[in-house]
């Protein structure tokens, strides 16, 4: 165990984390030249295309230090950098003793750098700052060193200058890992205690768990027990990734590896759970386990009603690999049958949609995303959790109060754009908690904001207001009471449930106006008149009329009597009236997206 080092790399999106991981693996000769490719640890196509890491990976590398003349076993645990997956980051850090904090030499410290840094500090990890991309023309390592000192309180002289792309400073990083990060503590003879920090589904092995062994050892044939559910399985394979899956005879205390135990469902092996042996169980679980709670909900509907079963199969198969997604069937009078799905955040939702269409060839209509509201009814003592605005009664007199989820948003921006950012945050009902300067050019703002205001276009607005320089991260705070009303959209007096949503009272009129105008543009004209109305309860607060397409029925009258023309026009009017009574308006997907734009 003296020669084992467990570490992870934490960084803001796009600071070069996956490239650095590739260089470390290459330097230690863990792969041949033939197997080289960019982003080796990003296994999904979508991760490569977007250049983001979604799934965690854990790689075992053997490193021979020429300076110390010693052999080391390094376990690199790669973490996703995106805010939606922050729970996964905290679990992977719990499996390590140290972390490389990667900072882009031209961008400097950004919001997720700070968020992930504090997560590492909470786990008492040894942090090695690495200033990456020093080969860029815009690199300014001295400014970054000052930021490291002032913002993070670390010794700037300990920062390593590197360029993962050019391979500069790689050996220095490896030496720092072996010298500064302590070896893992643990007792091989104690009862087994192992932390699951990731899992995925393999068609041949079943669900595979990536684990860090804290105490004891694990080999094929052992009967394991999971702490949170009490379920038991027999281990069929243990091993490590060297980036390829390699079988090993045993995993001992301090090791990081994978186990397979013919587990049928990924939901049985939850990230953060503790594994122990049935015959000799450990007394206490590793602290910090919680089930990932979906924060954002949206309806997924197949474009063709006949594809409903295919969508169900696709969601079932997909959720085997992604334990964070939840789904339940729901029916909408406007769109038909579909599913109400819960996601960790907006990026997670986009990824699920993209992977459904890519891996299962299914096109879906997505309704506007919403959050989980809590409401207290006057005639009931309990508090209801509501995932869709359709579950909220139209009669607001029955409701005592509504609570919505709030988050603490951290924004780091160049000082020139502070005014723009403050305006956006105030428009989104933000309450300023903190405002400080990190250095002469960079400001940090903290706002308490409703999650509903963030999930639609907040990220895009902040990026465009700061020419792409501002970065943003958020964490869940809790629920607060809000003055919300339900905005119902009616088309020819028929409420369309998929277009209704909750909105703050002060913004109701503005949003209703924007939405009916948007719908007027997107709904195609029919042969009869269409009325689009927005209502709060029984009060109509905005309406638009889409005129009918009409044939010129008086074209055949040459001159002649006015009463003849009037008769033809009256007849046409009667026909249109009848059509309006029985005609159905079909809504295009753009109509649902216009709800987003109005929000």
Curated annotation (Swiss-Prot):
SMART domains: EFG_C. It comes from the Bacteria. GTP binds at residues 14-19, 132-135. GO terms for cellular component: plasma membrane. One of its GO terms (molecular function) is translation elongation factor activity. Keywords: Cell inner membrane, Cell membrane, GTP-binding, Hydrolase, Membrane, Nucleotide-binding, Protein biosynthesis. Its EC number is 3.6.5.n1. It is a peripheral membrane protein. It catalyses: GTP + H2O = GDP + phosphate + H(+). Pfam families: EFG_C (PF00679), GTP_EFTU (PF00009), GTP_EFTU_D2 (PF03144), LepA_C (PF06421). GO terms for biological process: positive regulation of translation. It is found in: Cell inner membrane. It is an enzyme of class 3 (hydrolase). Residues 2-185 form the tr-type G domain. Belongs to the TRAFAC class translation factor GTPase superfamily. Classic translation factor GTPase family. LepA subfamily. NCBIfam families: lepA, small_GTP. HAMAP family: LepA. Required for accurate and efficient protein synthesis under certain stress conditions. May act as a fidelity factor of the translation reaction, by catalyzing a one-codon backward translocation of tRNAs on improperly translocated ribosomes. Back-translocation proceeds from a post-translocation (POST) complex to a pre-translocation (PRE) complex, thus giving elongation factor G a second chance to translocate the tRNAs correctly. Binds to ribosomes in a GTP-dependent manner. This is Elongation factor 4. The lineage of its organism: Bacteria, Pseudomonadati, Aquificota, Aquificia, Aquificales. The gene is lepA.
């Amino acid at each position: 165990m003296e020669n084992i080092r467990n570490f992870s790399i934490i960084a803001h999106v796009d600071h070069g984390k996956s490239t650095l991981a590739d260089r470390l693996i290459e330097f230690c000769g863990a792969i041949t030249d033939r197997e080289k490719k960019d982003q080796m640890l990003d296994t999904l196509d979508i991760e490569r295309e977007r250049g983001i890491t979604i799934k965690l990976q854990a790689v075992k590398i053997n490193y021979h230090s020429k300076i110390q003349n010693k052999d080391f076993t390094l376990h690199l645990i790669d973490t996703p950098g995106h805010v939606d997956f922050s729970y996964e980051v905290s679990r992977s850090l719990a499996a390590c003793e140290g972390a490389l904090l990667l900072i882009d030499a031209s961008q400097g410290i950004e919001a997720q750098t700070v968020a992930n840094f504090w997560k590492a500090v909470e786990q008492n990890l040894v942090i090695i700052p690495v200033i990456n991309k020093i080969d860029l023309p815009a690199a300014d390592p001295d400014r970054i060193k000052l930021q490291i000192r002032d913002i993070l309180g670390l010794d700037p002289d300990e920062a390593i200058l590197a360029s993962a792309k050019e391979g500069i400073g790689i050996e220095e990083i490896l030496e720092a890992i072996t010298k500064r990060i302590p070896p893992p503590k643990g007792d091989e003879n104690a009862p087994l205690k192992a932390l699951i920090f990731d899992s995925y589904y393999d068609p041949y092995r079943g669900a595979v768990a990536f684990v860090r062994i804290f105490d004891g050892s694990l080999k094929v044939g052992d009967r394991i027990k999971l702490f949170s559910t009490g379920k038991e399985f027999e281990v069929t394979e243990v091993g490590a990734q060297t980036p390829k899956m390699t079988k090993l005879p045993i995993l001992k205390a301090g090791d990081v590896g994978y186990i397979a135990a013919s587990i049928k469902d990924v939901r049985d092996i939850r990230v953060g759970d503790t594994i122990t042996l049935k015959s000799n169980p450990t007394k206490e679980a590793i602290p910090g386990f919680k089930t990932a709670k979906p924060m954002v909900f949206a309806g997924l509907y197949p474009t063709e009603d006949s594809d409903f079963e295919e969508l169900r199969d696709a969601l079932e198969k997909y959720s085997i690999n992604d334990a964070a997604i939840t789904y339940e069937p729901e029916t909408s009078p406007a769109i038909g049958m579909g599913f109400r799905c819960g996601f960790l955040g907006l990026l997670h939702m986009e990824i699920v949609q993209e992977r459904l269409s890519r891996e299962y060839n299914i096109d879906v209509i997505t309704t506007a995303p919403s959050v989980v509201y809590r409401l207290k009814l006057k005639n009931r003592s309990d508090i209801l959790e509501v995932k869709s605005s359709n579950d909220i009664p139209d009669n607001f007199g029955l409701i005592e109060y509504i609570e919505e989820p709030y988050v603490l948003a951290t924004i780091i921006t160049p000082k020139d754009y502070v005014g723009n950012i403050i305006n956006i945050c105030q428009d989104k009902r933000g309450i300023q908690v903190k405002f400080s300067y990190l250095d002469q050019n960079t400001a940090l703002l903290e706002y308490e904001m409703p999650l509903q205001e963030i999930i639609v276009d907040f990220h895009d607005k902040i990026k465009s207001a700061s020419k792409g320089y501002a970065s943003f991260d958020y964490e869940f705070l809790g629920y607060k009471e809000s003055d919300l009303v339900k905005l119902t959209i009616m088309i020819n007096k028929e409420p369309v449930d998929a277009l209704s949503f909750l909105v703050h009272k002060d913004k109701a009129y503005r949003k209703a106006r924007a939405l009916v105008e948007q719908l007027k543009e997107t709904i195609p004209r029919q042969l009869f008149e269409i009325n689009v109305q927005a209502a709060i309860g029984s009060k109509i607060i905005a309406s638009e009329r889409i005129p009918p397409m009409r044939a010129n029925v008086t074209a055949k009258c040459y001159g002649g009597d006015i009463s003849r023309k009037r008769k033809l026009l009256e007849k046409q009017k009667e026909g249109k009236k009848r059509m309006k009574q029985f005609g159905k308006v079909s809504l295009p997907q753009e109509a649902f997206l216009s709800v987003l734009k109005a929000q």
